[in-house]
A protein has these predicted regions:
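N-terminal alpha-helical scaffold/docking segments in eukaryotic complex subunits
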Residues: 1-69, 278, 283, 287
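Canonical positions in the second alpha-helix
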Residues: 77, 112, 154-155, 188-189, ...
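TPR alpha-solenoid repeat register
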Residues: 53, 86-88, 121-125, 129, ...
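Structural register within alpha-helical repeat arrays
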Residues: 56-57, 92, 133, 169, ...
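Long, ordered, amphipathic alpha-helical scaffolds
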Residues: 219-292
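Short coil/turn linking the two alpha-helices of tandem helical-hairpin repeats
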Residues: 17-18, 62-65, 100, 139-142, ...
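Short coil turns that delineate tetratricopeptide repeat
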Residues: 82-83, 117, 124, 160, ...
Length: 292
């Protein structure tokens, strides 16, 4: 029974990629928990899920700068699966990257993509490798923001159903202050993932910033649209901190007073979040409440 619970917990963390948001202490705890579980001999763990968890362990070790241990995990994968799967390619590029060889990682991935990989492999393989290449170029400052955007947009033309590409493009447009284009990209994300509450929240936030620099009539229209998206985000996730904060802030920007139902409801929900949620959300909710 205990093994079942641990297995499901670890698989959930992997499926949701929650570990990518963990702090160093949480990563260490996860690493230790995974190593203990993997040695426990769970007969219900399928081979597919075993490699699934080993993949997570690899990236946890990378995040913790345990490059030697990460190499050991990679070698285990390579010995069992070979080097040709896209996950192995991305792992190898990651190892090159953490060992300070960004140039080598970039050349390795570019060579793969240029050797007719676009036409000889499946969609998942090509786009996964292409996204990894862009990520390395971005972190290594190998490309300007405009050049990164150009590559991402080119990929959205080839792979219009990849939500992650549209999200990434929206983030770049947002940083550049091109809010209208950022909104368009987020709307594409929602066409692909219509129940993505975080995307509704981000769209609301982007519309809000666009409204702040617009003329009065357009400003009101944009704020109303931003509020609608914020409300949709909390409809999908009842205790979504960012969503309720946006509901409160946008309602106030629209000139509604403290007795307005939405302002009272959002304040009540922020109080609930500050009492129930994790420490990070509690602190953030309390800061927002102090300002309103």
């Amino acid at each position: 029974m205990l093994k079942d619970l641990v297995r499901e917990k670890l698989l959930t963390i992997m499926n949701t990629k929650a570990y990518t948001q963990f702090n160093p202490e949480q990563l260490l705890q996860l690493e230790n928990e995974m190593k203990i579980y993997m040695k426990s001999g769970d007969s219900a763990l399928t081979e597919g899920n075993y490699f699934f968890l080993m993949e997570m362990l690899f990236y946890v070790l990378v995040y913790r700068n345990q490059d030697v241990d990460a190499q050991v995990v990679y070698n285990t994968f390579r010995d069992r699966l070979g080097e040709n799967s896209y996950k192995m390619v991305i792992m190898k590029a990651t190892l090159l990257q953490i060992n300070g060889n960004d140039k080598g990682a970039i050349e390795y991935l570019e060579n793969l993509l240029n050797d007719d990989l676009e036409y000889e492999t499946d969609f998942v393989t090509y786009v996964s490798i292409a996204k990894k290449l862009i990520a390395i170029k971005t972190t290594s400052k190998n490309l300007s923001q405009e050049s990164v955007l150009k590559e991402v947009v080119a990929l959205t033309d080839k792979f219009p159903l990849d939500a992650e590409l549209w999200w990434y493009a929206s983030e770049i447009y947002f940083e550049m202050g091109q809010f209208e284009k950022a909104c368009y990209c987020l709307e594409q994300v929602l066409c692909i993932t219509p129940f993505n509450y975080a995307c509704f929240g981000r769209l609301s936030e982007t519309l809000y910033y666009e409204a702040l620099r617009s003329k009065k009539q357009t400003k009101t229209e944009l704020l109303e649209k931003a509020l609608k998206n914020a409300l949709r985000s909390v409809e999908l996730s009842e205790l979504y901190l960012k969503g309720w904060a946006l509901v409160n802030i946008i309602s106030r920007e629209l000139g509604r007073n403290k007795q307005n139902d939405l302002i009272k409801l959002s304040a009540s929900k922020l109080n609930e979040i500050s009492a129930k949620s994790n420490n990070k959300d509690k602190i953030t909710a309390e800061l927002i409440l102090n300002k309103i």
